[in-house]
Amino acid sequence: MESFETLEKLLSYSFKNKELLIEALSHPSLRQHHEYKDDKDYERLEFLGDAVLNLVITEILFRNFANYNEGHLAKIRSYLVCKETICMVGAKLTLKNYIIMTHGEEVAGGRDNLNNIENATEALIAAIYLDSNIETTYDIIEKLWAEFIKVQNLTDYDPKTALQEWAQASDHHLPIYRLIKREGASHSSTFTVLVKVKDYEQTGTGHAIKEAEKNAARSLLHRLKND
């Protein structure tokens, strides 16, 4: 596991209370470990971090997209706080290298588990908020999410249409969407869709197939824009 100092440099933030940082990176599997004395893991911080992230992203969009209506802003926010985007932020921070977990969880692929990365990223946001204030947290989130907010200029009307137009302009076949996973009860399912254009592919999740397709298209457009 890498030094927390490296993570703090990536965040451009140094924790006053290091225990908050440790809690934000402590996987729930530790609670079943007989040598683990503390009863804290990142689940409570994740709960708070989810709310803080939604608040900050909402305010960023409100300030920067003055001409967009409520429905449009909600769609953009849905992308910015979805699992894929949060995990891409976590990947930028190489967060998987810092999560504290049991050997069994690690052997089972816990470091590459997207749920773990998403949860730890949200918990980290909460830890920063509790260690500092909303203004500092706002600045850090705005910096970490800047490239994903910027890509909205390309996808603001419909990411599926934007991806189709890119494919046609590049003389590629039209995008192909495929449902690869459905999780949860029938009334609250989460769908995962894979979109492929030529040799490029990306996944997206949502509570409806169309939402998952749009999030997959957004993620692929973001990748294409940065390649």
UniProtKB/Swiss-Prot annotation:
* Reactions mediated catalytically: Endonucleolytic cleavage to 5'-phosphomonoester
Q: Where is the DRBM domain?
A: 158-226
Q: Which residues form the active site?
A: 50, 122
Question: What GO molecular functions are on record for this protein?
Answer: double-stranded RNA binding; metal ion binding; ribonuclease III activity; rRNA binding
Pfam families for this protein: dsrm (PF00035), Ribonucleas_3_3 (PF14622)
Top class in the EC scheme: hydrolase
Sorted alphabetically, the Gene Ontology cellular component annotations on this record are:
cytoplasm
Residues recorded as binding Mg(2+), renumbered to this chain, are: 46, 119, 122
> Keyword Magnesium on this protein?
yes
Cite the record's note on assembly: Homodimer.
Cite the NCBIfam families for this sequence: RNaseIII
Stated role? Digests double-stranded RNA. Involved in the processing of primary rRNA transcript to yield the immediate precursors to the large and small rRNAs (23S and 16S). Processes some mRNAs, and tRNAs when they are encoded in the rRNA operon. Processes pre-crRNA and tracrRNA of type II CRISPR loci if present in the organism.
Q: What is this protein called?
A: Ribonuclease 3
User: Which species expresses this protein natively?
Assistant: Rickettsia massiliae (strain Mtu5)
High-level lineage:
Bacteria, Pseudomonadati, Pseudomonadota, Alphaproteobacteria, Rickettsiales
